[in-house]
């Protein structure tokens, strides 16, 4: 549902700040106190404090950092090029009338991810003297958008990097995006591979086989036993010999949310008995030499290297046993699973990983080589489908805060003649200390319950209930300030931080731009992209602008943990004589969102695709490669079968009737129709306003 694609070549002034950063290793993180309250009161907040708080060094290396101005920077070429100030970049894009929310895609990061993966395999092959090569493929399902796939194919060309298709539509993309060889040799290895996964019908297999005539090298991976007979039949009819693979259901159990990708009840693949059945079918058809690849997948985002080691040991043994049964085994596709360190802890926490790319590669190579050497079987070409590790870092979601809601009411005055429950609450507030704060919390909880009961039975008026609630929250806030200074917080007070958190209303839809955050509680790094030289004194959660209580983010990264609030800055009000107060823009970034999020987003509340800007570095700074405008309201209405012209005509008719009945003036009708027609052509998200702050 992308909007119209507009390509721009706009060079702007460079900001050549160099960031010397390298890919993080796999050493375990050390717990440090990231609580802003722990910062000594007699010293100023620094960007080092922000780096520690938001853990940007952990999850952001080597691409993201903070500069001296307190702004997040991105180094798309890692340690080989300059850095861009994200805050200044967003300001420049807004001056070009590119509204928020927007997605920034950095194609140079894609290039760097491919370079790093291939370099790691090259080092591993050299270290172990592995007697074959590596041929990576990008699984299109991670992000199918055209500019992404085009960039990946372009940057992968020096490495003969191929594509993986998991469906018929993705096969159509792969066939048209990969450049076929003009005069391919039957056993040519130095060309991109096209791995054909997923469930297949006759047309899928026919198309894949005919692609060999074009000069492609498709490998049809059998996911179900029934596909073997179909492939044999179609191959015979077309007179084209296929390259076949089988996907194995490993007994090695994955981990995390995708652990069910393996095992006897996994959705995809063949069990060992089914593999033997497939081999016999191919043997009877005199096509056993067509079986050349073993594929497995133990799930996305594998956090522990031990799981990878176990899977590689099992898969390597299956590979050599297939070869001993007479299959012409030449390829081993280890699938996906190469993780992304979303929280920067470098541990086996589900939002992290306790290994780096080189660790992963070394374990893949050594396991395969050990098994093949022991069995005297030729070592295969190694294939991986590391989509998440390739695509995640290149996309950054930027959105603004349109309003906040704080629980910080003024302390009401309580007089001697007021109800006893109010006097009790005020007395509690006055006497809260570090020695009795837990007891005081229990007291105010009881008083609040009593106040509600008194109100429900008519013994307390509405104004008195309001006073009771204000006093209750004042007591809770005073208790929370004490809790923040303690090394240990009692269990019954742990929810205070959440209960008193501000709500920051974000101009975005979680369902459209971060669906995994809503659907599976995926953690993404989120932080302000500016004001990082200031202490973030607020604690908040994020609520999107959909009319859905699930449209919120209330889980944030911590060190091998999840925290329920995010440290944020108060909105800044600007007062000018003769004009309403204006709130300065406050921009937040959600990072590492380049895999799966865009394509899985939905139209909840009819919030459509957002603006996408492709940025590429050049000697002068950067240029906008592509601008893909987000959906307009008219476009989104069209997706759900409304004709905007019909809607506008209905509105004209209603206005005419209202004027005829003297319920509306001509000026009012014109204003309504102008607003309606103009709105149809506008972005589905909110325009910048003066901002709203409520307490």
Swiss-Prot record:
It comes from the Bacteria. This is Biosynthetic arginine decarboxylase 1. GO terms for biological process: arginine catabolic process; spermidine biosynthetic process. Catalyzes the biosynthesis of agmatine from arginine. It is an enzyme of class 4 (lyase). HAMAP family: SpeA (MF_01417). The modification N6-(pyridoxal phosphate)lysine is found at residue 141. GO terms for molecular function: arginine decarboxylase activity; metal ion binding. Its cofactor is Mg(2+); pyridoxal 5'-phosphate. PROSITE patterns: ODR_DC_2_1, ODR_DC_2_2. InterPro entries: Ala_racemase/Decarboxylase_C, Arg_decarb_HB, Arg_decarbox_C, Arg_decrbxlase, De-COase2_CS, De-COase2_N, De-COase2_pyr-phos_BS, Orn/DAP/Arg_de-COase. It catalyses: L-arginine + H(+) = agmatine + CO2. Keywords: Decarboxylase, Lyase, Magnesium, Metal-binding, Polyamine biosynthesis, Pyridoxal phosphate, Spermidine biosynthesis. Belongs to the Orn/Lys/Arg decarboxylase class-II family. SpeA subfamily. CDD domains: PLPDE_III_ADC.
